[in-house]
């Protein structure tokens, strides 16, 4: 069950300035996706997407369940045909029967009106791509778009989009207007260029159609595979919406980020930059790996920024010549023994220089002060000094004595 975040502030002594170090999030409207709410001050929602063929009903059910069990709160499924839309209905029912209801987003692309109308009957949210929903084959001989041609296609988009908007509106369901930098419509490219501005205008065109039909259960995304483009597009989208009095939540992601360490760094560079600006209400880290590997990255980003706390926060120095014990080995032992104690802050410091001061905000500290011995702290208070080989054991005993231990 989701809960509203509790604002926290950091304070200094009475004669010093008080600084609020919490991120001020952009105010957005709440958008319900099943039993999950995006925006409206609710915690940033974690999403992913299965990579099974939707026609494989059992495989898709298993994949959705695997993601949900490790913390994925909304799961996206590709729906490239009517047959896939019908299969998704069965997937949804089988999930409810064999596991539990999970909020699902149907991903619809090329000329997807009929598919979207079918799948909207069965799931909570439909994602459409403005560049592909009404797909116009590029004309290699074209040199410009006249205003009349631009508006003519705009009317065609409205005619095609309106039935889906009305269906979602009447059922109380949601839509993501998911713009991708790599698939802008030809008329947008001619008019605005291959730019963040073109991405924003593409989204605004669809938003205005939705608003004209009194539908506002909308989430927006502005994804790109290059971080500077992605960041610029989201910032511009947030500014334009603020200027226009719009308050739609934003779904953040770097599309096609790749794999391994660099894929994680690339996604974090884009997503965390925007979240630190207060922009973003739901995130997906897109990796060329098993979808399950995306979820820990999402939660790590949110924890590092102080937006959600779902694991133990470890504070540890990088080690140097002053370190009085094998810091890497001890940190591993401490982590393996305490990683289930969600909500605690635990510091492991190699010497007195980086000890009490750097770990002042931690609940518990493990500090090397004397060769062969470890000093254990509760907050800023040194509790006891113990032999190094008993350090981890005594840290656990201290946590237990405070009533903050739970068995894994």
Swiss-Prot record:
Disulfide bond residue pairs: none
Lineage of the species this protein comes from: Bacteria, Bacillati, Cyanobacteriota, Cyanophyceae, Nostocales
Cofactor(s) for this UniProt protein: [4Fe-4S] cluster
Reaction catalysed by this enzyme: (2E)-4-hydroxy-3-methylbut-2-enyl diphosphate + 2 oxidized [2Fe-2S]-[ferredoxin] + H2O = 2-C-methyl-D-erythritol 2,4-cyclic diphosphate + 2 reduced [2Fe-2S]-[ferredoxin] + H(+)
Domain of life: Bacteria
Protein name: 4-hydroxy-3-methylbut-2-en-1-yl diphosphate synthase (ferredoxin)
One BP annotation, GO: isopentenyl diphosphate biosynthetic process, methylerythritol 4-phosphate pathway
Function of the molecule: Converts 2C-methyl-D-erythritol 2,4-cyclodiphosphate (ME-2,4cPP) into 1-hydroxy-2-methyl-2-(E)-butenyl 4-diphosphate.
């Amino acid at each position: 069950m989701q809960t509203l975040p509790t604002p926290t502030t950091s304070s200094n002594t009475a004669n010093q300035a008080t600084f609020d170090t919490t991120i001020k999030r952009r105010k957005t409207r709440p958008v319900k996706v099943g039993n999950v709410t995006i925006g409206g001050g609710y915690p940033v929602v974690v999403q992913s997407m299965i990579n099974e063929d939707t026609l494989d009903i059992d495989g898709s059910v298993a994949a959705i369940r695997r993601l949900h069990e490790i913390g994925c709160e909304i799961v996206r499924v590709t729906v490239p045909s009517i047959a896939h839309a019908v299969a998704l209905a069965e997937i949804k029912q089988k999930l409810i029967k064999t596991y539990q209801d999970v909020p699902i987003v149907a991903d619809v692309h090329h000329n997807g009106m009929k598919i979207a109308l079918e799948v909207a009957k069965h799931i909570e949210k439909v994602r459409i791509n403005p560049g592909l929903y009404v797909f116009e084959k590029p004309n290699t001989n074209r040199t410009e778009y006249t205003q009349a041609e631009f508006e003519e296609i705009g009317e065609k988009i409205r005619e095609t989009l309106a039935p889906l908007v009305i269906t979602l509106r009447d059922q109380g369901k949601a839509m993501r207007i998911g713009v991708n930098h790599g698939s802008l419509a030809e008329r947008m490219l001619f008019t605005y260029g291959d730019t963040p501005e073109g991405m924003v205008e593409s989204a605004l065109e669809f938003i205005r159609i939705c608003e004209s039909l009194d539908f506002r259960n909308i989430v927006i995304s502005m994804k790109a595979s290059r971080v500077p483009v992605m960041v610029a597009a989201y910032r511009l989208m947030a500014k334009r919406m603020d200027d226009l009095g719009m308050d739609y939540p934003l779904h953040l992601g770097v599309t096609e980020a790749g794999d391994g360490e660099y894929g994680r760094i690339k996604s974090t560079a884009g997503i965390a930059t925007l979240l630190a600006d207060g922009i973003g209400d739901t995130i997906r880290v897109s990796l060329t790996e098993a979808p399950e590997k995306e979820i820990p990255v999402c939660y790590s980003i949110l924890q590092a920024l102080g937006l959600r706390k779902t694991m133990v926060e470890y504070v540890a120095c990088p080690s140097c010549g002053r370190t009085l014990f094998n810091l890497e080995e001890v940190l591993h032992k401490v982590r393996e023994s305490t990683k289930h104690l969600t909500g605690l802050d635990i510091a492991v410091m190699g010497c007195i220089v980086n000890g009490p001061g750097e770990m002042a905000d931690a609940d518990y500290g493990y500090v090397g002060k004397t060769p062969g011995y470890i000093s254990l702290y509760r907050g800023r208070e040194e509790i006891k000094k113990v032999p190094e080989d008993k350090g981890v054991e005594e840290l656990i005993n201290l946590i237990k004595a405070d009533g903050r231990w739970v068995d894994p």
